[in-house]
Amino acid sequence: YVQAYFEYDGKKSGGVTKSHLRFGDEPIRSSYLVRHADFVACHNKAYVANYDMVSDLKDGGSFLLACDWADVAALDAHLPVAMRRAIAQKHINLYVIDSVAIAAELGLGNRTNTILQAAFFHITGIIPDDKAVEYMKAAALKSYGKKGEKVVNMNYAAVDRGICGAVKIDYPASWAELTDETPAPRKDVPEFVTKIMEPVNNMHGDELPVSAFVGLEDGTWPQATSKYEKRGVAVKVPAWDASKCVQCNLCSYVCPHAAIRPFLLTEEE
């Protein structure tokens, strides 16, 4: 028996999706989201700075982080203090896997799902690794068989790399004693951003009291707030090469966020 619930944010490409999965030998009648998880995976390393992903993990649970931080020193530099402390206090089994690099090496672009799914089966041990590989390769053949042998083989390789690619981190016990850092004061940031927009973007909107919206009863929100929500979720960021630009303006035309704004000017202007 399998049950799945999903949470989404309001963004388009690169938005946050939370998948709540339960499975077992008996019918599942839990009509609520998972709040005591045995396994949690974070598929984008940028999320560690904004989202609380370990508070719902059981003591002794497993946390898989897709990142290129392969040792304790790198994790010390990038993981928030609260996350490291919770990991140590709950005796969480911490794993990392550089799924982005593996996908790029195999020619899969930014498609890391197969790699991370294989890592999930290996870490949880719900079925033997050889059976997981067998079932996943059968699913890949069914899904991608029409796209040719090359695509199928790339997904086969992704399964093989994912099943053995996760590295367990032996973090120091001192993580459990870490104290919170004092956040640096932020200047010129509107109260609306800190009290409403950022909690909503960090998936804590349900916790806001009604009093937080005093003055916004008609549903209107301030304008020009997108500059405060740079998510940093992209693996690669494009750069404009002036020497190759023919000024066709197609980039601006297709951009849904008006990130590129062309101006038609004369030499004098």
Task: Report the location of each language-model feature.
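Active-site cofactor/cluster-binding pocket
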Residues: 1-202
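Amphipathic, soluble alpha/beta structural segments
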Residues: 229-236, 242, 252, 261
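An acidic- and aromatic-residue-enriched active-site/binding cleft used to recognize and process polar
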Residues: 7, 68, 243-245, 260, ...
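Intrinsic disorder at enzyme termini
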Residues: 172-229, 233-238, 267
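Iron-sulfur cluster-binding cysteine motifs and their immediate structural context
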Residues: 224-226, 250-269
